[in-house]
């Protein structure tokens, strides 16, 4: 009996030791794989160049008219076809592992006007396995040690030099891969090949590929394949893409957007399959017939069909990208009519926004740029605009001259300050009963900026002109009061970047002095100080901090307008990635002009896996969540506090806020923004 007990104990101990040893070895192997890139990342070259071949096959299984509203999908409706193919050969230059410049040498496409499509899916062909984010827009990489807590791993030893690591996400969320496997070298930890599945931004995908074999190329795929399924508004598409990197032949930069098929045949690393050849043959047949009937159809091109496809489609429902012949100038215009640019704010109601950008490179260190931002608030029936033009004469030292013209919110004069001072209890404030005088505000700004200490200390100077006119001019005339006011104020601003402007930490101070010259009606001195910092945490988390104060030193004139640069209402709410953090969502807009000083503090915590993420089903579609906390001190309202919670999904973003002061509760408010196809 004693012998049996001893034998049993030895077996248990031996099994435990073997199990522990195997588990430790699994950890060691996983650690070796995750740390493999460190020697290369610490000595990363300034740039990497890759000759890349890309091909794609798109098949429409089900479609309806809403397909036209999906970015780059409009042209798939043009010819009534259901299958499309394109291939390209290009030179890609990778800078700092993030910025990629692409020179497209050859493009062959059966899509209308030789377009490419689904660029957001094409990005999945370049997974950054060793980065926190697998792709540019998201998804936590299972090879990053900081993301390890979100995945379960298993290891299978194939032989003395090879092993397979399988992984699966611990919860279903769009920021995590569902499952996958890695073929790795047991000795070095190098990933030989990979395979994984996931779903992000309405794209369900399966990716497989092989990694490079030597040096820093082992951090990147040498070839990659993706199969994706896209379902949206009743439309269903399948898209297959293949990419081959580091090909030996480099074409001269003078060859761009060529349609030379013979040249492509000599460069293509793999043969086209039967389906792809059939699509090309059908496309050539249709083109041949079109050329034969060109004379007959030329007159018909001015009809309604031509207008819908070429005028309405290209300019109203589709993003417009225009380049000059020398490729130095570019114009980018968002769709003129697109319901996806609608937003909602509890105070302004429904809003619509529009954005146009353009630029021209003079040299590598100088350029012209311009931007037009428009927004329409339906509840107020008001159009807001900002026109900005800039001449960058020294980009390396952030040297530029900028002109800006804009109209903002209706503003009240300093009489509101006098009214507020008479009130003893904030609960008794009735803004409507004050009969405040409202003014339209037109703003012009000229600024000169230059980094005195490169990337650390910048100085901006210029002047600001405000032209304010009364909304009710007849009432001013009857009262014998001036209905138009103008201010001319030179300013100087200093920005300090303690860690250089490559890091999100900046302190800014600005002094503004209004003078009674050039038609100015009054004088004032104003100071503002502002500090902003974003602390990036592991796993796509971040903590944003902002604090500031402002005050008027001197005010002289018939009337005054208390108007701050860093404490004002954003009159057109944008999406998740704009100014959701650092704003006061429930504060009555009259308070922005009712105090001759302010102190503010804003804190925002962002994480892809926070609260709702852990809820069944709903947590699957949550991309990121935020917690907000803001505090404000102004005349008669100190302290005022807002707290809120927000989240964004593939379709929309939403924020819920509440605000209160020691003697008053502001209630609750919501903010909505459409994020559909934001990353497409």
Predicted segments, located by residue:
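Structured extracytoplasmic
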Residues: 22-162, 169-176, 239-344, 435, ...
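Gly/Pro-enriched, hydrophobic low-complexity segments
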Residues: 155, 160-259
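Transmembrane beta-strand segments that form the barrel wall of outer-membrane beta-barrel proteins
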Residues: 191-198, 226, 332-344, 355, ...
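Short loop/turn motifs that connect adjacent beta-strands in outer-membrane beta-barrel proteins
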Residues: 320-333, 346, 361-369, 394-401, ...
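Outer-membrane beta-barrel transmembrane strands
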Residues: 346-348, 358, 431-465, 499, ...
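Residues that define the transmembrane beta-barrel architecture of outer-membrane proteins
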Residues: 348-352, 381-385, 440-444, 482-490, ...
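Residues on the lipid-exposed face of transmembrane beta-strands in outer-membrane beta-barrel proteins
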Residues: 352-358, 387-391, 446-452, 463, ...
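C-terminal outer-membrane beta-barrel translocator/porin domains of Gram-negative envelope proteins
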Residues: 400-418, 428-434, 501-502, 506-609
């Amino acid at each position: 009996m004693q012998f049996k007990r001893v034998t049993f104990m030895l077996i248990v101990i031996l099994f435990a030791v073997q199990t522990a040893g195997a588990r430790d070895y699994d950890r060691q192997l996983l650690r070796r794989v995750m740390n493999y890139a460190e020697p290369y990342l610490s000595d990363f070259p300034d740039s990497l160049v890759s000759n890349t071949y890309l091909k794609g096959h798109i098949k429409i299984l089900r479609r309806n008219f809403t397909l036209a509203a999906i970015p780059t999908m409009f042209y798939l409706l043009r010819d009534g076809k259901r299958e499309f193919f394109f291939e390209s050969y290009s030179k890609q230059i990778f800078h700092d592992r993030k910025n990629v410049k692409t020179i497209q040498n050859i493009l062959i496409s059966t899509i209308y006007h030789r377009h490419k499509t689904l660029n957001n899916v094409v990005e999945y062909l370049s997974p950054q396995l060793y980065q926190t984010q697998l792709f540019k827009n998201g998804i936590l990489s299972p090879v990053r040690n900081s993301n390890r807590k979100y995945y379960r791993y298993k290891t299978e030893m194939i032989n003395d030099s090879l092993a397979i690591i399988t992984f699966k996400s611990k919860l279903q969320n769009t920021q995590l891969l569902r499952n996958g496997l890695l073929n790795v070298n047991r000795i070095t930890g190098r990933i030989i090949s990979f395979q994984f599945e996931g779903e992000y931004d309405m794209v369900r995908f399966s990716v497989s590929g092989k990694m490079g074999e030597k040096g820093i190329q082992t951090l990147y795929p040498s070839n990659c394949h993706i199969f994706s399924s896209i379902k949206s508004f009743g439309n269903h598409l399948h898209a297959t893409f293949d990419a081959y990197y580091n090909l030996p032949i480099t074409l001269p930069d003078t060859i761009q957007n060529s349609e030379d098929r013979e040249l492509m045949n000599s460069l293509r690393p793999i043969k086209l399959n039967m389906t792809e050849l059939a699509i090309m043959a059908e496309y050539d047949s249709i083109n041949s017939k079109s050329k034969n009937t060109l004379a007959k159809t030329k007159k018909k091109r001015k009809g309604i069909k031509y207008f819908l496809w070429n005028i309405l489609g290209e300019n109203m429902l589709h993003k417009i990208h225009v380049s000059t012949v020398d490729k130095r100038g570019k114009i980018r215009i968002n769709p003129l009519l697109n319901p996806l640019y609608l937003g909602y704010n509890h105070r302004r109601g429904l809003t619509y926004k529009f954005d146009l950008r353009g630029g021209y490179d003079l040299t590598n260190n100088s350029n012209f740029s311009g931007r037009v931002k428009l927004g329409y608030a339906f509840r107020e029936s008001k159009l807001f605009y900002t026109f900005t033009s800039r001449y960058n004469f020294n980009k390396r030292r952030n040297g530029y001259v900028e002109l800006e013209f804009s109209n903002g919110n209706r503003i009240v004069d300093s009489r509101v300050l006098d009214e507020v001072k008479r009130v003893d209890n904030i609960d008794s404030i009735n803004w409507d009963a004050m009969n405040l005088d409202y003014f339209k505000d037109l703003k012009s700004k000229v600024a000169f900026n230059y980094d005195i200490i490169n990337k650390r200390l910048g100085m901006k100077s210029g002047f600001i002109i405000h032209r304010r006119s009364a909304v009710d001019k007849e009432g001013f005339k009857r009262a014998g009061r001036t209905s138009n006011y103008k201010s001319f104020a030179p300013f100087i601003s200093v920005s300090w970047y303690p860690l250089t402007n490559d890091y999100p930490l900046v302190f800014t101070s600005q002094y503004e002095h209004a003078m009674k010259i050039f038609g100015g009606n009054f004088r004032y001195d104003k100071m503002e100080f502002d500090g902003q910092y974003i602390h990036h945490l592991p796993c796509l988390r971040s903590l944003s901090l902002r604090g500031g104060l402002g005050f008027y030193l001197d005010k002289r004139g018939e009337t005054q307008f208390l108007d701050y640069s860093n404490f004002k209402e954003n009159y057109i709410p944008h999406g998740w990635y704009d100014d959701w953090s650092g704003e006061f969502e429930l504060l009555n807009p009259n308070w922005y002009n009712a105090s001759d000083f302010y102190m503010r503090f804003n804190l925002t915590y962002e994480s892809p896996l926070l609260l709702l993420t852990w809820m069944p089903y709903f947590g699957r579609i949550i991309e990121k969540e935020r917690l907000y906390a803001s505090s404000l001190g102004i005349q008669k309202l100190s302290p005022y506090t807002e707290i809120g919670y927000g989240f964004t999904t593939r379709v929309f973003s939403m924020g819920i806020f509440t605000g209160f002061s020691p003697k008053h509760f502001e209630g609750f408010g919501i903010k909505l923004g459409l994020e559909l196809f934001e990353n497409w």
